[in-house]
């Protein structure tokens, strides 16, 4: 009976990891990415990545970059963790490149277009480049997305979809906020649509990603419980196995063949 319970626990942990594998692959920002020269590189913009960050004021700007071929599809979305203090947080998402234009975009979100020599952006557009800025102009609160593995919910904001990028080269995604309502808050930048998890990721990426997400949502109780279970459950299994082996040894000693 106890062996069955242990197997069931391992099965639940494994299937929970599988649920997360049907989602964004976490991409951590370790160093500063506060200008074009230090932009965080997205290895493959087609892979489904999730970047969890926080803007700390109207002058805080985050930069990301990726390489693409002509005709590639681009998908990017801003989501906000469902915490009441971020309910009105609506950061902007910009795409900067040499020849992108608002006409390349799909969808019905508010779009602003800038050349390098004009604009009210909190960053300077490099010479020879242009920027399109997609803002969220929908209802607040916006539609929600529930992530089952971490038991967390997000408010979905704007999407940026380009079915065919105009040229080969380096593209920059820039996240910033100039809102008069709320200029500080946490966001998730999702890029790409192809889910790409290996077996190794189940053990090297997914467990710490679960922990990081809980901290991102300021949930410090769940990690404490999870860590306690990781310590207690193996200990109980070990104690059970030791006792069982001891009983077998004593039985053989008392009733030798």
Region roles according to the model:
Residues 1-21, 228-236:
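Secretory targeting signatures
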Residues 25-35, 64, 85, 90-103, ...:
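C-terminal edge strands of extracellular/lumenal beta-sandwich accessory domains
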Residues 22-50:
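N-terminal leader/pro-regions and domain N-caps
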């Amino acid at each position: 009976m106890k062996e069955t319970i242990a197997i069931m626990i391992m099965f639940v942990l494994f299937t929970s990891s599988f649920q997360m594998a049907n989602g964004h692959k976490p991409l951590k920002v370790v160093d500063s990415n506060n200008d074009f020269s230090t932009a965080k590189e997205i290895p493959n913009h087609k892979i489904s990545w999730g970047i969890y960050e926080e803007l700390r004021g109207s002058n805080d700007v985050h930069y990301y970059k990726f390489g693409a071929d002509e005709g590639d599809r681009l998908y990017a979305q801003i989501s906000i963790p469902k915490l009441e203090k971020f309910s009105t947080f609506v950061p902007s998402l910009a795409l900067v490149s040499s020849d992108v234009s608002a006409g390349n975009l799909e969808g019905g979100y508010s779009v602003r277009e800038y050349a390098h020599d004009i604009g009210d952006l909190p960053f300077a557009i490099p010479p020879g480049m242009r920027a399109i800025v997609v803002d969220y102009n929908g209802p607040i609160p916006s539609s929600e997305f529930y992530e089952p593995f971490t038991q967390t919910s997000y408010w979905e904001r704007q999407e940026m979809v380009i079915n065919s990028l105009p040229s080969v080269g380096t593209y920059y995604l820039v996240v910033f906020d100039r809102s008069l309502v709320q200029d500080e808050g946490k966001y998730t930048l999702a890029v790409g649509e192809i889910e790409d998890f290996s077996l190794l990721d189940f053990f090297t990426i997914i467990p710490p990603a679960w922990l990081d997400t809980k901290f991102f949502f300021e949930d410090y109780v769940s990690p404490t419980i999870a860590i306690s279970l990781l310590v207690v459950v193996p200990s109980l299994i070990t104690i059970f196995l030791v006792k069982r082996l001891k009983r077998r040894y004593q039985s053989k000693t008392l009733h030798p063949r």
